């Protein structure tokens, strides 16, 4: 998710809370969940991997997300950097990838899901990519990861200030696997909310761009607003 400007934070934060509540009701508080098989995260994913070691440059269209970009379950692209083009293969980000901060006390375990279509975008080696095996698992795995940040953080190795999240420990995490009908119904509920979040974000990015374009002209007097009746 692309981080929205403050203008719309409250709306999207409320939508995020709704999504989290729905996930909890369907998959945590639901007594039927005990009947679903317990499986490893590895069995439900096609990729669990750290990102790349980038070579930074301003003269590139390729974007590298870092740990600062992942906060409060949002992805803030404005804090990303550009790097020299390389063949990245499977580490190009895809819609639905779950991103997990993987180094450092206080940041390790933070998670967010890619709910936009990324273009020429990857992550650095301090972030783990978790890719669901299919579209039917996308929202389930993403929201499961976001709701299990503390459990993910507890998997760390190393001493204070040098903590790391081992990939194998992430892959070995266990979760319930709902039946396909339940997943389909859950996706039908979640998808419109996610779509609304993205629409709000895109609108706010557009408004922020207009604001940033107009403000210098207003400050310099290039645009005269003295005759506007309020």
Tell where the protein language model's regions lie, with residue ranges.
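Active-site donor-nucleotide binding/catalytic segment of nucleotide-sugar enzymes
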Residues: 31, 60, 65, 161
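Short coil/turn segments at secondary-structure boundaries
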Residues: 37, 54-61, 155-157
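Non-catalytic DNA-recognition/assembly elements of restriction-modification systems
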Residues: 2-52, 172, 176, 180-225
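Short beta-strand-to-loop capping motifs
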Residues: 85, 131-132, 175-177
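A short beta-sheet element
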Residues: 89-150, 156-161, 166-170
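Glycine-anchored helix-breaking recognition loops at helix->coil/strand junctions
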Residues: 12, 67-68, 124-127, 142-204
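Sequence-specific dsDNA recognition surfaces
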Residues: 42-55, 63, 68-98
């Amino acid at each position: 998710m692309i981080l929205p400007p403050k203008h719309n934070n409250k709306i999207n934060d409320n939508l995020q809370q709704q999504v989290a509540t729905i996930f909890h009701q369907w998959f945590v508080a639901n007594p039927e969940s005990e009947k679903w098989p317990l499986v490893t995260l590895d069995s439900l994913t096609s990729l669990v991997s750290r990102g790349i070691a980038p070579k930074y440059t301003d003269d590139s269209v390729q974007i590298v997300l870092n740990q600062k970009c992942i906060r409060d379950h949002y992805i803030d692209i404005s804090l990303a950097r550009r790097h020299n083009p390389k063949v990245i293969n499977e580490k190009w980000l895809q819609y639905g990838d779950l991103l997990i901060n993987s180094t450092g006390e206080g940041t390790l375990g933070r998670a967010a899901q890619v709910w936009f279509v990324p273009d020429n975008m990857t992550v650095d080696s301090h972030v783990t990519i978790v890719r669901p095996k299919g579209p039917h698992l996308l929202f389930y795995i993403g929201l499961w990861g976001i709701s299990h940040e503390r459990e993910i953080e507890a998997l760390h190795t190393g001493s204070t200030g040098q903590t790391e999240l081992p990939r194998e420990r992430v892959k070995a995490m266990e979760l319930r696997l709902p039946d396909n009908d339940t997943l389909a119904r859950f996706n039908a509920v979640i998808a419109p909310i996610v779509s609304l979040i993205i629409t709000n974000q895109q609108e706010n990015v557009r408004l922020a761009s207009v604001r940033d374009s107009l403000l210098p002209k207003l400050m310099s007097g290039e645009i005269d607003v003295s005759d506007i009746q309020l």
